[in-house]
From Swiss-Prot:
GO biological process: proteasome-mediated ubiquitin-dependent protein catabolic process
Name of the protein in question: Proteasome subunit beta type-2
SUPFAM superfamilies: N-terminal nucleophile aminohydrolases (Ntn hydrolases)
Species name: Caenorhabditis elegans
Subunit structure comment from the entry: The 26S proteasome consists of a 20S proteasome core and two 19S regulatory subunits. The 20S proteasome core is composed of 28 subunits that are arranged in four stacked rings, resulting in a barrel-shaped structure. The two end rings are each formed by seven alpha subunits, and the two central rings are each formed by seven beta subunits. The catalytic chamber with the active sites is on the inside of the barrel.
Family per record: Belongs to the peptidase T1B family.
InterPro entries in UniProt: Ntn_hydrolases_N (IPR029055), Proteasome_beta2 (IPR035206), Proteasome_sua/b (IPR001353), Proteasome_suB-type (IPR023333)
Length: 199
């Protein structure tokens, strides 16, 4: 039912997550659920899945990466965070405490001087450094749009317009009513929260 969108160029990454909470698979219980977990100053994670798993895994990941930065005096890079999340989910699969979550990780790597976008699913399949990614059923409607219209040198305005086009297509074609999306952008200057996309 949920939907995550990620678009990346060399200069920025845009992430959007729906704000809905569904109960019993079909009842809209809440339209203000925040699925974002800030992992650093220029690093964030959007997480969907079983509600309890999302809350526990998201908070656990956030606190572990904060602890790492306190102990070592620096934050992990986006690609390191991606590997940490993938390994954590993979280790959970081999125990009784596995997490049924799908995540998008976006950030800006100051060392490599470029944006990062990656994903990990609930089976610990990881995709790193991708131009665009989706999680959730609605993504099936959007890959064709991206294949046709994505350009690696898009401006922020063009990237946001493309993201809005994908969200609009999901709204038009998906059976569930997803009332709004939280949108963030990360670039060299840092993290910014943009206005929510509401319907």
């Amino acid at each position: 039912m949920h939907f995550l969108v990620g678009i990346s160029t060399e200069n920025y990454v845009i992430l959007a997550a729906d704000k809905a909470t569904f109960a019993y698979g079909a009842i809209l219980a809440d339209s203000e659920n925040d699925k974002e977990y800030r992992l650093g100053k220029k690093l964030t994670m959007m997480c969907i899945g079983e509600e309890g798993d999302v809350a526990q895994f998201g908070d656990w990941t956030k606190r572990n990466l904060q602890l790492y930065s306190v102990r070592n005096g620096y934050e992990v890079s986006p690609s390191c965070a991606h590997h940490f999340v993938r390994r954590s989910i993979a280790e959970g699969l081999r125990s009784q405490d596995h997490y049924t979550v799908d995540v998008l990780i976006g950030g800006y790597d100051d060392k490599e001087d470029k944006a990062f976008l990656g994903s990990v699913d609930y089976l610990a399949n990881g995709l790193g450094q991708q131009p665009y990614l989706f999680r959730g059923f609605c993504g099936r409607f959007c890959y064709a749009i991206m294949d046709r219209e994505y350009k690696k040198d898009m401006t922020e305005a063009e990237g946001l317009a493309l993201m809005n086009k994908c969200i609009g297509e999901a709204k038009r074609r998906f059976v569930a009513n997803i009332p709004g999306y939280k949108v963030v952008i990360i670039d060299k200057k840092g993290y910014r929260k943009l206005d929510d996309v509401l319907f």
